[in-house]
Amino acid sequence: MPKLRSATSTQGRNMAGARALWRATGVKDSDFGKPIIAISNSFTQFVPGHVHLKDMGSLVAGAIEEAGGIAKEFNTIAVDDGIAMGHGGMLYSLPSRELIADSVEYMVNAHCADALVCISNCDKITPGMMMAALRLNIPVIFVSGGPMEAGKTKLSGDIIKLDLVDAMVAGADERVSDEDSEKIERSACPTCGSCSGMFTANSMNCLTEALGLSLPGNGSMLATHADRRELFLEAGRRIMDLATRYYKHDDESALPRNIANFNAFENAMTLDIAMGGSSNTVLHLLAGAQEAKVDFTMDDIDRLSRKVPHLCKVAPSTPKYHMEDVHRAGGVMGILGELDRAGLIHNDAYHVAGKNLKEVLAKWDIAQSQDEAVRKFFSAGPAGIPTTKAFSQDCRWDSVDDDREGGCIRKREFAFSQEGGLAVLSGNIALDGCIVKTAGVEEENHTFIGSARVYESQDDAVAGILGGEVVAGDVVVIRYEGPKGGPGMQEMLYPTSYLKSRGLGKACALITDGRFSGGTSGLSIGHVSPEAAAGGTIGLVETGDRIEIDIPARSIKLAISDVELAARRSAMESRGKQAWKPVDRIREVSLALKAYALLATSADKGAVRDVSKLED
């Protein structure tokens, strides 16, 4: 039977000093010998997805202590990608994932915690905590802050749903009046919670359900709804159950690496493809798999993308549905239920909410569940009242959306598309692959041939788009923005938004070794690997080159001869120390970012740090 990790600092005469310090935190004599459960919170007043989390740790702690454990809370950082977008702040977003993972590891291992509750929500926080949880491999459960309500306003006499991207596009579109732009801005983000569409934060919180690491509803129940309170309380109870199973009964199925195994990663990626999740999830799943010591790669993602249909279409791919609508349709469990009936997932995978996924779906999939409490749970809806407070309303839809032919979630035979929402492309410009969110690409653009318009940075690309350099038929190439070359692999939401505002959203393509916000739509191809700074072919593209994109064939090609390509590579290598670096780019890079760049890998490896580089 495994010994409690915390015994290292709580048992034996030689730990008198440590016990004295534990007592100073409120630990009583009767507490020593109980499991110490770490609560990793991510409250901050900088981020709407985290502004309401201050008291959530106390909720979880109360449930843990009622169940016989000791709860100790600490906090991590949280970067708001939307606020950091479009300026130097975005360089810090992806590297913050590694800092979050490290900080959780540091706190949990330094204090010998026995188990972990991760209170996360936004873009890099859930992935960072996931990496730490799989690295530590102690009992863990995730509970997120939940999505915000969709914005709503009246324009031209019609009530429309809004999100952050609508505000960005309107602000850059000269055809939108100042009055309408301000109206959209004031309405786009009405409440606390992660942005209301299927952006990165919500995608990742949904994927924790598929990985088996969070409770049903975690990814879809609104942050403002009173029903979400029970998720936090249940997380506290469940983590004690998991800790008991492992430490008292030697049940290793309670450990995250046994829950999030290869089959679970396949389930998560299958869900991601079916719901058209953010392309950033590919980075984070690849990174998580490495921490879990699971051999899950871009090849597996490519294989799955060819057979999984697009069953759930959500903003930014359509203005009709937001996360509140996904929840009404049964949430993640509704999508997984349809995938299960299509024979596309492993329903024997372990899950923190039950014995296995099959058992969990039997209760929580509204298409098969007979439990009226479950239908009531998924009827939780928005109030339409601006607020920064969690659990502030108890509104409900009159009915759930169980229309699997024309609703938000569909059966396989009525899918939005038999092609999934994400695809891996490869070719001479991306030898190790790249990612496109096909859910946001118009069918007429699934094949595209255009002329390269090359920029050495996101800033130059934005200036070129707004300055009229980019015209219909161009393929905008933004390079040296990968994990190493940026450094930090910036999101390119502003360039894609500005293309839309110029009426070029369907007339141009954009490819980059950077990445895209979950709010991006259009023919936007990111994660080009190897990146330019690592010697990737994208660093050899010249303005005017012909680029051929064929999503059905999963190919992307720089249409020049092998001889010409070899000559360009030779010329680049001849530049010595200036090879594979941007020309004339002025950018302040801090010591912290330089340290990240030294170890960063390209996107096909999850942009994780490779410490073996220190040994070369």
UniProtKB/Swiss-Prot annotation:
Transmembrane segments: none
Active-site residues per Swiss-Prot or TrEMBL entry: S517 (proton acceptor)
Lyase found in the keyword field: yes
Protein's GO biological process: isoleucine biosynthetic process; L-valine biosynthetic process
The EC number(s) this enzyme carries: 4.2.1.9
Isomerase listed as a keyword: no
Cofactor(s) this protein cannot do without: [2Fe-2S] cluster; Mg(2+)
NCBIfam families to which the protein is assigned, alphabetical: ilvD, PRK12448.1
Function recorded in the entry: Functions in the biosynthesis of branched-chain amino acids. Catalyzes the dehydration of (2R,3R)-2,3-dihydroxy-3-methylpentanoate (2,3-dihydroxy-3-methylvalerate) into 2-oxo-3-methylpentanoate (2-oxo-3-methylvalerate) and of (2R)-2,3-dihydroxy-3-methylbutanoate (2,3-dihydroxyisovalerate) into 2-oxo-3-methylbutanoate (2-oxoisovalerate), the penultimate precursor to L-isoleucine and L-valine, respectively.
Protein name as catalogued: Dihydroxy-acid dehydratase
Organism, as annotated: Shewanella woodyi (strain ATCC 51908 / MS32)
